[in-house]
Structures are given as C-alpha cells and as structure tokens.
C-alpha cells in the first residue's frame, strides 16, 4: 500500500528535499506556505525541471507558495525562468546589495517575478528605501524580540522603530511577541507559529471545539451538503473530531458496535442529532467565555487556529503519502491516526488516556502510542517534511521507512496545492 523508492537515475524530485512552513496572517489564517528546497544532487537539479514538477499553474485558491531554494545556482536559474502563478521567490538580502545581483533582480521583477527578500531585521531596520519595494522575510534575533516587547509600552520610543510594518517575521517564539507583530506592528504574516507558548498560555482553560468550524458545518448542513463534504468540514478541528467519536462510542449513546471512522459516526448521528450536539458544544463554549471574559474568546479561538490547522496539514500530508490506489477507508484511518498523534497538546491530557476512550485499530494505536507499525512511517516522514531546518535528514528518514523521496516530495506538493483554510463565518445562534 505504500509507494516504493524509484530504482533509476536521479530525477529532479529525488534530487531535492522539500519541506514546508506555514505563514499565518493577521487573522491567524493560512496565507502562504514557504517551500524550502534543499538540493541534494546539484548535477540533477535545474530550475526549469523543478518548476515543471511544481506546476506552472499553481492553483489560485491555494495558499501563495514561497519558493526558497538553498543554493545560489538554483536561485540564479529560477530568476531566469518565467514566474509561476501565485508564487513568490525568496532571495537572500546579499543579492539586493551587489550591483550585479540587483540588476538581475530588476530584470526578473520586470518579467513578473514576485520577490521576497530574506534578511535579518537588524540589517535592514534603518534603511530608508527598500530595494525594488519588495516585501521582506525578516529574521528576529533575541535582541529584536526584547526591543519590540520593551518599546510596546514605552512612552519614549515607538514600536515602528523596533518592527517594520507589512513584512513577514520569522523567529517569533512567544505568544506575546506574535500578537505584537500581527496586531500592533502591522506585520503581513508570521513564518511559523509559537505553538508551545500559545498552548502554555491556554493550559488552564478547558479546550473547546472551534466555533468557526462549527459555523462552517452548520452552513453546509443548511445547504444540504453531502456526507463527504460534511466529513471534510468536521475534520478541520481535531478537538471536534475526537469528541464526536468519543460521543458515538460512549455507553450513554448505546450503540452495539464500535464506530472507528468519522464518516460512519456522522451517518449514525444524522443531521438532526449532529445539529443538536453542535449547539451544545457552542453553548459550552459560551459558558466558558462568560467565566473568562468575552474579550478572551476571540483571542483564544484565533490564536489556537494555527495550532489546529498545522495538525490538519500534517495529517493530510500523511494521508497523501499513501499510494494513489489506496482505499478511502484506509486514507481516512491514516488521517485520524496522524491527527490524534498530536491530540495531547491541545487537550492537555496524557495521550494514552485519550486514545483509550476510542476504538482505534491496532495499527493506529501502534503509530500513536508506540511509534511503530505501518502508519508510523507515514507520520514520521510527514513530521520530517514539516521541519525545514532539518531537511538534510529527510532522505535518511525516507530510506528508513522505504518511502521514495520523489514520492514524498510529490505528496507534499499535492497536499499544499489542495490546502484551503476556512474563512470564518458568522451565524446567528440557533
């Protein structure tokens, strides 16, 4: 059921290691994805064939793809190629400072390339005019972070001197700094999200189902969507998926047979019972909100969304790593396995206790609790592709699990091309 590595001469997609990192907007939605390209075999890699493998017509509805090659040779070739739709090309700051490099960037920009300058904030903070008026991906160091947080409440200094508006920031390690960048300094987005600090700041609050996802589900139900569409909506929220499966398998529900799949659970519930249960989840959320203050609801909901959706992206990648001919029920099981493997982070409970409440298959339990079995290798490769700083280790991870590097790279591209973050919808309470 799993793709084998190709035993042939190197092709462009088994000569690079691709990794991804989401960019989150001020609304805490997925606005772009940085695709790191780590070149393994330079003699087999050129921009023309790599661009062709990525696809000349990157979907407009997909998140903007930030192409980030890690060698000067590949960047040089990429600048000479026609631009790909809905993509940006990341170029190191040094290219903008050298006359020859700047001339090449001017020409590439005139041909339609959207350039993203990668620089340290400390190196460009004092510049008056940005070369070519490009957006920048700015790396924060600890001193930058300290300065931004210090100036936030200073009457003598302004925040604009610490951070530049309209840019993408990387290296944001705290929840407070993320809020400063997005809400006060006017950042375009954040590369990555301070998951652990955000989760730590919400550790004393009872985790709730996402109201935004519930609203989307209710819209779909009003429109009489198919069971397949309903399943896609529900599985956007790991907490909602877990609680729904726990509900239908509880003694209170009284079913004689265990329900392992989300689709089966939705069919057993039916629209009427599901709608009633969703109203109960939102009511519980409102009770929690009234106890903590209305102002905290939006912050909790929005700031947790990047954590939840990153889990969804990794689960979808694990699913795509299956062979194209795999059955739907197998794909669904792999998705749930990957989703539940990270559930303890959201629910602040030991993973073993959470999983015991669900009738998961032995393969799923092996992957989640023991890091073993056939599903574990899918989860492990998906994890490695979501860790760009360690992309050099991806070939070894793929070899260990007998998954071809080319297949892993294609799976990642398919996952990203079909990623759609939901737009929050407001519905009058039922």
Predicted features by range, described:
Residues 5-88, 95-99, 104, 306, ...:
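Bacterial c-di-GMP phosphodiesterase EAL domain
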Residues 15-20, 33-37, 64-65, 85-87, ...:
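Generic preference for hydrophobic/aromatic residues in regular secondary structure cores
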Residues 41-50, 119-125, 140, 222-224, ...:
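Generic structural signal for short, solvent-exposed loop/turn connectors between secondary structure elements
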Residues 62, 146-430:
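Conserved alpha-helical "signature site"
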Residues 81-196, 333:
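The catalytic core of metal-dependent phosphodiesterases that act on cyclic dinucleotides
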